[in-house]
């Protein structure tokens, strides 16, 4: 049968929230009898920001802050007739706060 794949990318600063969101999407897919692959951990991007501790003096005294963006990929194999239903169910599901979701249909 001809199937289309729906790629769902999840991004979050907290790895526990992103894992919970991936679990929720996989459980939703199992309820709808959809073949799933993942969650595939994608590379974590790391941003480091260096600022001066004092405003006008002590150039040697600096402080560093770091933010990590964790990413996961979930792939769903869906029949073309159910594609719209599945994307609506996923976009309307209650995911944890702080999780960004990108849905790509191919």
Curated annotation (Swiss-Prot):
Involved in the binding of tRNA to the ribosomes. Part of the 30S ribosomal subunit. This is Small ribosomal subunit protein uS10. The keyword Cell wall biogenesis/degradation does not apply. It comes from Mesomycoplasma hyopneumoniae (strain 232). Keywords: Ribonucleoprotein, Ribosomal protein. Coiled coil: none annotated. It holds the Pfam family Ribosomal_S10. GO terms for cellular component: ribonucleoprotein complex; ribosome. PANTHER family: 30S RIBOSOMAL PROTEIN S10 FAMILY MEMBER (PTHR11700). InterPro entries: Ribosomal_uS10, Ribosomal_uS10_CS, Ribosomal_uS10_dom, Ribosomal_uS10_dom_sf. One of its GO terms (molecular function) is tRNA binding. GO terms for biological process: translation. PROSITE patterns: RIBOSOMAL_S10. It comes from the Bacteria. Belongs to the universal ribosomal protein uS10 family. NCBIfam families: PRK00596.1, rpsJ_bact.
């Amino acid at each position: 049968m001809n199937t289309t794949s729906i790629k769902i990318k999840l991004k979050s600063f907290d790895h526990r929230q992103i894992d919970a969101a991936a679990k929720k999407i996989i459980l939703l897919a199992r309820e709808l009898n959809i073949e799933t692959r993942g969650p595939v951990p994608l590379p974590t991007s790391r941003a480091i920001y260096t600022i001066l501790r004092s405003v006008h003096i002590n150039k040697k005294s600096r402080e560093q802050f770091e933010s990590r963006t964790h990413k996961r990929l979930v792939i769903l194999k869906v029949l073309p007739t159910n594609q719209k239903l599945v994307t609506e169910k996923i976009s309307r599901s209650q995911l944890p706060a702080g999780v960004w979701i990108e849905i790509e249909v191919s």
